[in-house]
Amino acid sequence: MRYVSNLPHAVKEEEHVVVPARDGTRLSARVWRPVSSDTEPVPGVLEYIPYRKRDLSAVRDSIHHPYLAGHGYACVRVDLRGTGESEGVLADEYLEQEQTDAEDVLAWLAEQPWCDGNTGMMGISWGAFAALQTAARRPPSLRAVVLASFTDDRYADDMHYMGGALLSDNLAEAGTMFAYATCPPDPALVGERWRDMWHERMENTRPWILNWLRHQRRDDYWRHASVCEDYSAVQVPVLASSGWADGYSNAVTRVLEHLDVPRKGLVGPWSHKYPHLGEPGPAIGYLQEVVRWWDHWLKGVDNGVMDGPMLQAWMQDSVPPSTSYEERPGRWVGEPSWPSPHITPVSRALLRHRIAATGPAPTAGEPMTVQSPLSVGQFAGKWASYNAPPDLPYDQREEDGGSLVFDTEPLTEPVEILGSPSVELDLTVSEPVATVAARISDVAPDGSATRVTYGVLNLTHRAGTGEPELLEPGRRYRATVQLNGVAQAFPPGHRIRLSLSTSYWPLVWPAPRPARLSVYEGTSTLTLPVRPTAEPDELPQQPFGEPEGCPPLASTQVTAPEERWEVRRDLIGYRSALEIVKDRGTVRIDDIGLDTGLRAEERYTATADDFTSVAGETAWTMRFTRDDWDVRVETRTRMRCSEEEFHVDATLDGYEGGRRVFSRTWNETVPRDAL
C-alpha cells in the first residue's frame, strides 16, 4: 500500500466526541474532518461498529478515515452502545435499539455546523450490515452507502446457518462478541465511571450463542434487519464489494439483482478484508473508488462513477491447493447487469464417478451411495477466511476419500464460470435428519484438487422456506444444493470435480446420526454458470489504481503474535481435533501509551464416527494496560450435543490489577430442531 500524507485538505481529529441518543445514552465518536469545515461545511460519513475505536480498530481506522477526511468529508467512527467508550450494554447483534441509535447519530451528524446536511454510511462486515440496515429505515440525511463483506439475509447467508445447517462459525463469532461486549471503556476518556460501566456490561451480558441457538429456523428474529425481506425499502445508491475467499461472497450479486437504485458491485479474490487491504491480492485502490462514490452522491460531482459495467469481478486462474495465498492470479471482467446476459447455465448429468457431457437423462439409473466419516471437513478451512495462515481449504483429495466424486473428462478448452453453481439431487437418505455438502474442485493433471466453491444443505430444509420438514427414510426426494458464487477459470487438461459428502465437520455441525445418502445417476445434475471465454471483459487490464491510504497510527509490537491451525489425530482413541490459535501479541498504541492484548483459541473435537461426540470450544483473553491500570476479560464457551439437544457451558471472568473482580457461569440446554 502507498501511504499518502499530502491530501487536498488539512485534517483535524477529535478523539472523543459525545453523541446523545434519544434515551439519553451517550455514544462515543471519533471524528476526522477538514480544518476548512469550520467555515465550509462538508458531507458526513459514518462507520458504526462495536470494535473499539480507541484501541482495537484504531490502526485500521487511521488508514481510511483521515484519507477520506483529507478529500473533503467529515468522517465519524462511532462505537456501538455498550462497546468502547459508549455507554450501555450490547446485548446482541442488529437489534432495533442499534438501528434507532444509528438514526440518532446520523441526525446529530447532519446537524453539526461542520456538516452540510448530507450523510453516507460505510463499513465492512458489521459496519456494512449496519449501513444497509439503516438505509432500509430511510433516515432523511442519508444519501448513499458503501458496503464491504456483508449480507442481506441474516439467516441463510451469515455465519450462523447455511442451507439450514448450523455453522461452527456461529460458536466462534459468539465467542468473539462475548469478549468484545464485556471489555471496559478507557478511564482516560470516561474518567472514574469506567468501572461502573464495565461492571454493568459484565452483569448484563449473556453468551450470545444461547440466543442464536434458540432460533434454528427462519423466524422473526432473523427476518428483522434482513433487507432481503423488502429490497424496496432501500432507496439510496449502493456500492457493494466482497471477495471470493470470504464467507460473504454472495450478497453482492443479490443486491445487484434485487435493488432498484443506482448500484455497483465489486468482487475480488479477497478474504474478509477491505479491498485496499485485500488478501489474497491483488489489493486495489479502493479508497479512491470510495472517494469518487461520495463525490458523486454526496457532493453532486459529475465524475462518471456510474459508467462502465455494473459488476466488476476477479476471474481467478487455476492455482495449486494451499491454505493461504499472497496473490491469486487472474484478471478483472465486467458484466453490464446482473443477472448477466453473458452467463449461460449449463446442466450436466451425474453418472457413476463422472460428469456427463450432456444434460439429465429422462429416467434414473442406479443409486450411488455414501456415508461419510466425520473426518471429511477437517481441511475445509474457515467459513469466513481472513487469509490468516492457514484458514483456506487444503488439497481436497483426502476429503474426497469420504465422498461421492464425479469428474469431467480432461478439458480440451478453457471453461470459465461466474456466479453460483447448483446441484440438483434425486436422492434417498437413511435418517429423518441429514446434511449434504457439495464441493467443486479444480483437479490438475497431477491429481491435486483445489476447492473452488462449496455449498451445504440440511435436507430437512429442502423446500427453502426456513421451515424444516423431517425426511422419510428410503423415500425419493429432489433437493437443490446452492453453492457459493465464484469466478473461476479451468484450463485445458484439468478436470472439474463435484464431491458430495454427508458430513463437513467442523465447518458444519453434523446431523444427530450418521446418514447414508443415495444419489440416482442420470437424473441428478450439476449446473454451472458458464461465461464464454470469447466474451469481452469490458474492462482495461488494470481498472483500479494502486492501494493507498493514510499512514497508520503509530504502534509497537511489544510481544510477538502467534497463528496456529493444527489437525491432531489420536489413532488409539480414534479422537481427532482441530486446534486454532490467533494471538495478536501485545500491541502498544504509542500516542496513548496503551498496551492491548488479544488471544483467541478454538478447538473442535470428535471421536471416531460418533456424531454426538463432537464438541466445540472457544476461549478469549483481552487485556488492556497502562501505567497502574491493568484489566482483562476472559471468556470460555463450550458446546456439546446429544441426538436431541445442544449443551452450552460458558464462563466470564473479569480481572483488575491481577485480581478477579467478576465471575459468572452458564450451563444451558437447547433442543435441536430438525438440526
Question: PLM features: what roles do these ranges have?
Answer:
Residues 35-110, 159-160, 432, 438-446, ...:
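Cap/lid segment of the alpha/beta-hydrolase catalytic domain
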Residues 124-133:
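Glycine-rich nucleophile elbow surrounding the catalytic serine of serine-hydrolase chemistry
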Residues 234, 240-242:
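Short beta-strand/loop motif that positions the catalytic acidic residue
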Residues 2-38, 407, 411-413, 426, ...:
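N-terminal cap/lid segment of alpha/beta-hydrolase-fold proteins
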Residues 250-263:
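Active-site-adjacent alpha-helix of alpha/beta-hydrolase-fold enzymes
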Residues 61-62, 70, 133-233:
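Accessory cap/linker subdomain of secreted extracellular hydrolases
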Residues 276, 280-653, 659-675:
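C-terminal, loop-rich substrate-recognition/catalytic regions characterized by aromatic stacking residues
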Residues 113-125:
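Alpha/beta-hydrolase fold nucleophile elbow
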